[in-house]
Amino acid sequence: MRSTIKLAGFLILVSFFFIQARATQPDFQNIFQGKDGCFVLYDLKAGKVACQYNESRCQREFAPCSTFKIAIALMAFDKGILKDENTTYKWDGVDRGSPSWNRDTSATDWLKYSVVWYSQRITPQLGAATIEDYLAKFDYGNRDISGGLTNFWLGSTLKISPNEEIEFWKKLWRNELPVSQRAMTLTKKIIPMEISPAGATLAGKTGSHSTKTNSLGWFVGHLDCKQGEYLVAVNYGEDKPPARNTYPGMVAEKLCEKILEEMQLY
């Protein structure tokens, strides 16, 4: 009788955890809604991938777009081109169609509003040889900057996969990149952060590229929640332009939040 009770209790416990596991498994097809998308969740404490969707896309390289601002920030802080999070560049007066871009911009606002012209002030100061050296040390994607100093990361020659983005962010969050500790600390400080109703923090960077016939969206970030500490990457593509007044990177960020909510992590 006692063994029967123990067996029944064990089966109930197994059933409970099975139900819990099913409840926290995202419905990826419903979330991406026809988009060719992928997702990676890396558990920093366990040191392994906790969840991955569409592995083949996670292995493909794409233009990093504005997610590359993280690498630019690391280089610029390390070289002293940016002194701190308040380093400000003056607006050149050119109307770029956005109030947040048409003004003097600090390093913090550069990432917050994803100001492309701020990046384009930094990369010529770094120079091609220096950037190539850093990218080799970072082991960043295909390291190809032949597309030009002011746009090689913007739908051009530089490519990186979602899996490679996770590896790069892993080195950043573990303070293992070949730059100064101060450069890594300041870079992490200026990464935009959101706080969920449950108190989880998600610090990350969007990336967008689009033409008249296609869209590419990125979100890569760091999640700190009661269940642990994770790195996340979302990437998707569509054979159509984004909706009016919509940036694919913002869509990718919302997709990431939805996935994490369904996993009960955010």
Where do the language-model regions lie?
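Bacterial N-terminal signal peptides that target proteins for export
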Residues: 1-9
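Bacterial N-terminal signal peptides
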Residues: 8-16
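Beta-lactamase-like hydrolase cores
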Residues: 19-63
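Structured C-terminal helix/loop/strand segments within mature extracytoplasmic catalytic/sensor domains
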Residues: 24-31, 124-129, 174-200, 204-266
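Active-site SXXK
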Residues: 61-85, 110, 232
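Short, well-structured active-site flanking segments
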Residues: 78-93, 179-184
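Acidic helix-start/capping segments at beta-turn-to-alpha-helix junctions
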Residues: 87-103, 109, 115, 126-127, ...
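Mid-domain, small-residue-enriched loop/turn segments at the edges of structured enzyme/sensor domains
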Residues: 99, 106-107, 119-169
